[in-house]
From Swiss-Prot:
The gene is ZDHHC3. GO terms for biological process: lipoprotein localization to membrane; peptidyl-L-cysteine S-palmitoylation; positive regulation of receptor localization to synapse; positive regulation of synaptic transmission, GABAergic; positive regulation of toll-like receptor 9 signaling pathway; protein localization to membrane; protein localization to photoreceptor outer segment; protein localization to plasma membrane. It is a multi-pass membrane protein. This is Palmitoyltransferase ZDHHC3. The active site is at 157 (s-palmitoyl cysteine intermediate).
Length: 299
């Protein structure tokens, strides 16, 4: 008697009723091309608003408390241009990280027709998520906030109200880098401004009253120090994750490595684009994946 080749399914909840592909409905209509990705999560939206508010607060203090009242016009112009450029790039990176599809797996694609179209060999394993009824590529994980399986998911970040995954990791790294830079720049300017005010008359070093000036500068100093530490750690963690080609979830779960090992430089190019260029530092340049290997549906 001839045996019919079968394929093995694995799901994250071990529920037998989910193992039948017929249980899944056809995937919904994906919508028009270019539809904006946005997660409707109250906590994430609030965190994103707070992020913008803190950056704009820093802009206000830097411009109206320190730079505009300064008599050194060259100092004010140079630092104003640098700080505003970094702040603009930080907010642009935040928008791209928040509004870019991080790599969502098509929802409801675990249908009999789709599974047959994969042309799987006998004995091959496919991963199926019962929560969104999707066939998951290798290294994809389900996000309970986004309610989707995300390819190469690192973590869900409420500050960008999105998952950090295959398609938006570059923008998240740039966001942490530029926030760290403007925090460091703001702290340096606060230090110089305090020295200037101690040497001169406090009533002449700011257009605000001395008590108001001190309060605004102390708040900015606290904000800058907090964000400098936080984003520097996140930036270093992300760069290390990229170089080792191991996401935060994979490190946490200590998952077995089933993908080909590549050099650190190739891993960097896979995230930031091929080849190396100034576009790596631009949130407006979409990474060109070049010859980067796609993450397959089977292992």
């Amino acid at each position: 008697m001839m045996l019919i080749p079968t394929h093995h399914f694995r799901n994250i909840e071990r529920k037998p009723e989910y193992l039948q592909p017929e249980k899944c409905v056809p995937p919904p209509y994906p919508g028009p091309v270019g539809t904006m990705w946005f997660i409707r999560d109250g906590c994430g939206i609030a965190c994103a608003i707070v992020t913008w508010f803190l950056v704009l607060y820093a802009e206000f203090v830097v411009l109206f408390v320190m730079l505009i009242p300064s008599r050194d016009y060259v100092y004010s112009i140079i630092n104003g241009i640098v700080f505003n450029l970094l702040a603009f790039l930080a907010l642009a990176s935040h928008c791209r990280a928040m509004l870019t599809d991080p790599g969502a797996v098509p929802k409801g694609n675990a249908t009999k027709e789709f599974i047959e179209s994969l042309q799987l060999k006998p004995g091959q394993v496919v991963y199926k998520c019962p929560k969104c009824c999707s066939i998951k590529p290798d290294r994809a994980h389900h996000c309970s906030v986004c309610k989707r399986c995300i390819r190469k998911m690192d973590h869900h970040c409420p500050w960008v109200n999105n998952c950090v995954g295959e398609n938006n990791q570059k923008y998240f790294v740039l966001f942490t880098m530029y926030i760290a830079l403007i925090s460091l720049h703001a702290l340096i300017m606060v230090g110089f401004h305090f020295l200037h005010c101690f040497e001169e008359d406090w009533t002449k070093c700011s257009s605000f009253s001395p008590p108001t000036t001190v309060i605004l500068l102390i708040l900015l100093c606290f904000e800058g120090l907090l964000f400098l530490i936080f984003t520097s750690v996140m930036f270093g963690t992300q760069v290390h994750s990229i170089c080792t080609d191991e996401t935060g979830i994979e490190q946490l779960k200590k998952e077995e490595r089933r993908w080909a090992k590549k050099t650190k430089w190739m891993n960097m190019k896979a995230v930031f684009g091929h080849p190396f260029s100034l576009g790596w530092a631009s949130p407006f340049a979409t990474p060109d994946q070049g010859k980067a290997d796609p993450y397959q549906y089977v292992v």
